[in-house]
Amino acid sequence: MNRILSVSFYLFFLYLYIYKTYGKVKNTDHELSNIYGIKYYLRNGLSDKKNGKGQKYQDLEEDENDDEEDSNSEESNNDEENKLIEGQEGPNSDGDKGPNSDGDKGPNSDGDKGPNSDGDKGPNSDGDKGPNSDGDKGPNSDGDKGPNSDGDKGPNSDGDKGPNSDGDKGPNSDGDKGPNSDGDKGPNSDGDKGPNSDGDKGPNSDGDKGPNSDGDKGPNSDGDKGPNSDGDKGPNSDGDKGPNSDGDKGPNSDGDKGPNSDGDKGPNSDGDKGPNSDGDKGPNSDGDKGPNSDGDKGPNSDGDKGPNSDGDKGPNSDGDKGPNSDGDKGPNSDGDKGPNSDGDKGPNSDGDKGPNSDGDKGPNSDGDKGPNSDGDKGPNSDGDKGPNSDGDKGPNSDGDKGPNSDGDKGPNSDGDKGPNSDGDKGPNSDGDKGPNSDGDKGPNSDGDKGPNSDGDKGPNSDGDKGPNSDGDKGPNSDGDKGPNSDGDKGPNSDGDKGPNSDGDKGPNSDGDKGPNSDGDKGPNSDGDKGPNSDGDKGPNSDGDKGPNSDGDKGPNSDGDKGPNSDGDKGPNSDGDKGPNSDGDKGPNSDGDKGPNSDGDKGPNSDGDKGPNSDGEHSRSKNDNKKKKSKKNIINMFIGM
């Protein structure tokens, strides 16, 4: 065995000597040239001599340089693939200036200024200023200023100022100032200042200053400073100092000594002996014989024969024949012929000809010509010229000059000088000293001692059984069957089947199937199937299936299946399956399977399996070494 090894070593070194002296070096690369001493001969003045093949060493030096250029050109591709490891600045890399890279200035990159990148200024990027990016200023991005982005200022973005974004100022965004966004100032957004948004200042939004919003300063919102909101200082709100509120000392509150309260001795309370109470003998109570009660024979009750009840024959009831009821023939009912009803011919109804209705010609209706309606010419309407409307010139409207509006000069508005407004000095406003305001001691506010608040025992409160309350069976309440309530079947309610409600099937609601709602199937809602909603299937929503939403299946949404969304399956979303999203399967997303994403399986992504990505299955240095060694062996055999 030792003899065999000795002979093998002898033959090997003999081969090296012969090859070094007489062998070919024309086809060898830079490494073989170093091994076999070509530079040694050149350094020692032997460049003018000829080798055994009749070639000058000077010619060999030129051939060697050509081989080095060839090897460098072949290695350049590998170097471009290994720039994520070496920190160079080629395109589609991590930390360079090329397009579709991570941490550079190219498009579709991560942390650079290109589009569709992560942390740069390009569009569709993550953390940059491009559109459809994450954390930048481009559209459809995450954390930037572009549209449809996440955390930026573009539209349809997340956390920026663009529309349909998340956390920005654009419309339909999440957390920004645009409309239909999440956390911004746009309309129909989440956490911003736009109307019908979540957490912003728009109307029918969540957490903003618009009316009928959640957590903002608009009226009928949740956690904001508008009236009829949850967690603000507006009327019919949760956690404020207004009347009919929850947690204050006003009348008709929950947990206080006022009338229509919960757990006190006043009338219209819950668990006491007063009228309109829950479990007592007063009127408007729950489980008693008084009027406006739940399960009793009084008027305005739930499941009894009184007026304004739910499932009884009284007026203003739900599913009975009384006025102002839901599904009966009374006035102010839902689906009956009475006034103020839903789908009947009475006033203040939904889809009828009465006033305060939805889709009829009465006042205070939705889509009719009456006052306090939605899309009509009456006051307190949405999209009409009446007062207290949305997008009209009436008072209490959104985007008009009437009182109680959003962005106008009327009272009860958002951003105007009228009373009951947001950011003005009038009563029922947000941030002023008037009643029904946010941060003041006026009535109809959230977190104060006035009536019509949330956290007290009065009507229009949260957690009681009075009318216009949250969590009771009265009208305009949250969690009951009355109109304009939360979780009931009335119009403009939260969690019911009425329009402009939260969690119901009406339009502009939260968690229902209506448009502009939160968590329902309507458009511009939060968590529903409507467009421009949050968590629903509509467009421009948050967490739903609509477009421009957050967490839904719509386009430009956050966490849904729509395009330009955050965490959904749509394009330009964050954490969903759409394109240009963050953490989803769409293209130009962050952490999803789409192209130009961060941490997904798409192309131009960061940390995914796609091409031009960071953390993908690219060729490493070990692969390059294997290629070089394989090439050396081939050249050695060629030289022999």
From Swiss-Prot:
Which UniProt keyword terms apply here? Malaria, Repeat, Signal
Q: Which GO terms describe its cellular component?
A: symbiont-containing vacuole
Localization annotation: Parasitophorous vacuole
Q: Which Pfam families match?
A: S-antigen
Quick one: where is this thing mainly located?
Answer: other
- What span is annotated as the signal peptide, if there is one? 1-23
Q: Where is the composition biased (Basic and acidic residues)?
A: 47-59, 94-623
Composition skew (Acidic residues), residue ranges: 60-79
Q: Where is this region: Disordered?
A: 47-640
What biological function has been recorded for the protein in this entry? S antigens are soluble heat-stable proteins present in the sera of some infected individuals.
What is the protein name for this chain?
S-antigen protein
- Tell me which species this is from: Plasmodium falciparum (isolate Wellcome)
